[in-house]
Swiss-Prot record:
GO terms for biological process: tRNA pseudouridine synthesis. Homodimer. Gene3D superfamilies: Pseudouridine synthase I, catalytic domain, C-terminal subdomain (3.30.70.660), Pseudouridine synthase I, catalytic domain, N-terminal subdomain (3.30.70.580). GO terms for molecular function: RNA binding; tRNA pseudouridine(38-40) synthase activity. The gene is truA2. Its EC number is 5.4.99.12. The active site is at 53 (nucleophile). It comes from Bacillus anthracis. Formation of pseudouridine at positions 38, 39 and 40 in the anticodon stem and loop of transfer RNAs. This is tRNA pseudouridine synthase A 2.
């Protein structure tokens, strides 16, 4: 069986997320599977590295699919980009080992979150960032971020859909940056629970607004109570930035 790795970019604003929900749904997975199935002449499933939610974007999503026939990578890329909607782009196609699995073989993921932090709205970024109109205390946010780096039980930063055997995840790095009206948050880790990144960003926003003390983060982690974080950052500001294998 021939196995092909896809690197994908998409604007998630109008989609219901990555994961296919039905035969004719408006999802990234569904759109790509439909075109690949047409190309190879049989129903074909793709496996994505990250099941991004509705409204979330990707700069480097990775997926794989298998085919009975040998395919030419550049022709696959050309075909997919010709027939996919223009808010989904295949940036690379690569034949890989038949055991390669986009979800199970990933070693690290990096997400970027964009906050538009000006009093006025930014009409050009409304689908691609979260607007916070009060000035954020970035210094306090950076202090809070330090408490989240490392291996922790992140139950408090998940939602009820997170039903993993272990809620322990390792955050390798968590950066808070200011740039031209934006506050950007970049987080890397070995894996993330459902809504974990958006909850982390939400907690940092609460700290930045003075609604939560940076020093309270360790106690929140220890308590493992989901109701401790009131802010779930909007999907629009979240980007899957990179995946490492």
């Amino acid at each position: 069986m021939n196995n092909y790795k896809l690197t994908i970019q998409y604007d998630g604003a109008r989609f219901k997320g990555w994961q296919r929900l039905g035969n004719n749904d408006n999802t990234i997975q569904g759109k790509i599977e439909s075109v690949i199935s047409e190309m190879v002449g049989k129903e074909t499933e793709i496996i994505g590295c990250s099941r991004t939610d509705a409204g979330v974007h990707a700069l480097n999503q990775v997926a794989n699919f298998q085919s009975d026939e040998k395919l030419v990578e550049h022709k696959v890329k050309k075909y997919l980009n010709q027939y996919l909607p223009n808010d989904i782009s295949i940036t690379n196609v690569e034949e890989v080992h038949d055991r390669f699995h986009a979800r199970y073989n990933s070693k690290a993921k990096t997400y970027l979150y964009k906050i538009w932090n000006e009093e006025h709205t930014n009409p050009f970024m409304r689908k691609y960032s979260m607007h916070v109109n009060k000035k954020l205390n970035v210094k306090s946010m950076k202090e809070a971020a330090k408490h989240l780096v490392g291996s922790h039980d992140f139950t408090a930063f998940s939602n009820a859909k997170s039903k993993k055997k272990s809620m322990v995840r390792e955050v390798y790095s968590l950066e808070v940056m200011e740039e031209a009206g934006f506050v950007q948050i970049r987080v890397s880790g070995n894996g993330f629970l459902h809504n974990m990144v958006r909850k982390i960003v939400g907690a940092l926003i609460e700290v930045g607004l003075g609604q939560l003390a940076a020093e309270a983060i360790p106690q929140i982690l220890e308590a493992k109570q989901r109701n401790q974080i009131n802010c779930l950052a909007e999907a629009s500001g979240l980007y899957l930035e990179n995946v490492e294998f």
